[in-house]
Each structure stands twice: as C-alpha cells, then as structure tokens.
C-alpha cells in the first residue's frame, strides 16, 4: 500500500516509521532543510531524537508530490499536522486538485477561533469528499517509534476509510479498533488535554494519588457530558479515545499537557513554560474553546473552569483547587 504522512513532527514521524515497515511510505515536511536532514541522518533530531528511522521511509518537501503518492483508491493519506494547520492543508489539497481518495487526521483539539472540531473543518473545506476519519487513542510518539505496543481507534462514517486505515496500521505492535463515532473520538481527544493540565497541577502541588484519581474520574464525567451534548455516544468515552487517552495523558511523564500543569504548580508563568516547551500543548490552545462551548450548551465543567482560571485569569493553582473543593455536594 502507498501511504503519505503529512507532517514530520514527533507524531507524524513515529507513525511514518511504523507504516514504513510494511508499506511504501512517504513523509512530507514543509521545511526543506528538515527533509534533507531526515534523509541524510535517518533520524528526526528536532522532534524525535535518538530513534533510528526505517531505511525504506522516504521524505518529500513538495506537497503536490506527497499528495500524488496517496491518490489511488488503495492508498491512504495521514494528516499529522496540529489542529491549527489542518484547515490550511485541506485547502492546499483542494487547490492542488489532489485530494486523496482516503485520509485520516491524528490531531486533537478544537480550532481556536471558530471552535470547530477537525471533522467540521474538513467538511467545510472539502464538502464533496466523504472518505475520511480520525485516528486517535492513548499513544506517545516515542513509544510508537520504538515499536512498543499501542492500541488506537479509527472512527469514520466511511467503511472504506476504516478498512484502508486498518490495513495500513494494524501490524506489528499496533492494534487498531474501528468505529463511526467521529464526534465522540474528537471530543475525547480534545478535552483530555485540558484535564491533563489539571492533574499536572494537582501532582505538582503534592496533593496525592487520591486527588489524581478524583480528577481523572470527574474529568471523565465532564468529557462525557460535553461529548454527548455535541452528538457523541456515551460509550465512546469509556474506550481508548476517552478514558484510555485521558489516563495516559494525565499520568504519563511524556505528556506535554501534564508537564504544563506541573510547571504551573511550581510557579512558572505560562509564557515561560510554552517558550521552553518547544512543542504544541493542545490543552492550552483549546481550553478556552472547550469552556466556551460548554457554557453555550449548558454543560457543567468545573475542572475545565478551574484550568482556564489558572491559564488565563491569573488564579493561583492552589486557589483553583480550593475552589473545586468548596463546591456544593451533589449526587454522582
């Protein structure tokens, strides 16, 4: 199978490395210097240093060439750009008249200014296309690149898209599950990043494992309430892309969003944290959108409220936690 991966950050590189073991895989990056470096070193030192890339993986800086690689009906395109870049890539595919027959995205979050989920952006930019979906689940790029076991879910309304994605990814140490709840999968992937900031704050303040468990559990309830309000199915949020991804992101030391929370608890400013991070922390990007949508829909999300208060309103992390503890008692 021919596969094109668009985006050579840590996640795109890791997925391309996995795919190249079985398939004719091409990894596209906008930065020609990065492409040259990848080809010369067989390592993405910028985003995934120390991981040797498969000898069969090829690299490309020209988007039209990369898209042409994935045009056939038995091919697949994987969009590994962040949410902020998804709409532009869809427009580029449309303008180049090279929309792949089947494609999936792996970004998580809401578009900041429009509050759109990824599938809504795709539908707006490519209204005549139908075979697309989202690939998501509990996964750190470095572990995937190292060939460690992982389970992901592809959600799409298109059976053909689900089948192509399964055929491409389901091998080696990667297990793929299929479904059609695109909204539920996307909401889980977005909200868990915000909740991971909350657990990072709690852990950074030394509040203990009981507090962490409470935040994960009540955070899952918030995620599910919002997801159902937006059209997702409740059972999706107890699966890989809901509870599974939340557990990993909230507790794993490779989590950028958890790291943001830990550093906020230590007294660092958000600007300094993001400047030093060097990578996207989607929880920061989409927290306002999540809270805005929740308020609009009448969905109670107190943990998300507390995170936004710390991120954007100057509330001290310990004061935000105290506010949560002072909430009125209620039935679970």
From Swiss-Prot:
User: What subcellular locations does the record give?
Assistant: Cytoplasm
User: Does this entry carry the keyword Lipid biosynthesis?
Assistant: yes
Q: Which family does this protein fall into?
A: Belongs to the NAD-dependent glycerol-3-phosphate dehydrogenase family.
Q: What is its main location?
A: cytoplasm
The residues annotated as the active site are 192 (proton acceptor)
Which top-level group of life is the source organism from? Bacteria
Q: Which InterPro entries match?
A: 6-PGluconate_DH-like_C_sf, 6PGD_dom2, G3P_DH_NAD-dep, G3P_DH_NAD-dep_C, G3P_DH_NAD-dep_N, NAD(P)-bd_dom_sf
Annotated pathway: Membrane lipid metabolism; glycerophospholipid metabolism
Concerning Pfam families, the annotation shows:
NAD_Gly3P_dh_C (PF07479), NAD_Gly3P_dh_N (PF01210)
For this entry, the protein name equals: Glycerol-3-phosphate dehydrogenase [NAD(P)+]
EC assignment:
1.1.1.94
Kindly list the GO molecular function terms attached to this UniProt entry: glycerol-3-phosphate dehydrogenase [NAD(P)+] activity; NAD binding
The residues that hold NADPH are 11, 30, 108, 141, 256, 280, 282
Q: Does the keyword Oxidoreductase apply?
A: yes
Gene3D superfamilies reported for this sequence? N-(1-d-carboxylethyl)-l-norvaline Dehydrogenase, domain 2, NAD(P)-binding Rossmann-like Domain
Swiss-Prot/TrEMBL keywords: Cytoplasm, Lipid biosynthesis, Lipid metabolism, NAD, NADP, Nucleotide-binding, Oxidoreductase, Phospholipid biosynthesis, Phospholipid metabolism
Q: List this protein's GO terms for biological process.
A: carbohydrate metabolic process; glycerol-3-phosphate biosynthetic process; glycerol-3-phosphate catabolic process; glycerophospholipid metabolic process; phospholipid biosynthetic process
- Catalytic reaction equation(s): sn-glycerol 3-phosphate + NAD(+) = dihydroxyacetone phosphate + NADH + H(+); sn-glycerol 3-phosphate + NADP(+) = dihydroxyacetone phosphate + NADPH + H(+)
Residues holding sn-glycerol 3-phosphate: 108, 137, 139, 192, 245, 255-257
Record-linked NCBIfam families: PRK00094.1-2, PRK00094.1-4
Q: Which GO terms describe its cellular component?
A: cytosol
Q: What class of enzyme is it?
A: oxidoreductase
Membrane-spanning ranges:
none
As for what it does, the entry says: Catalyzes the reduction of the glycolytic intermediate dihydroxyacetone phosphate (DHAP) to sn-glycerol 3-phosphate (G3P), the key precursor for phospholipid synthesis.
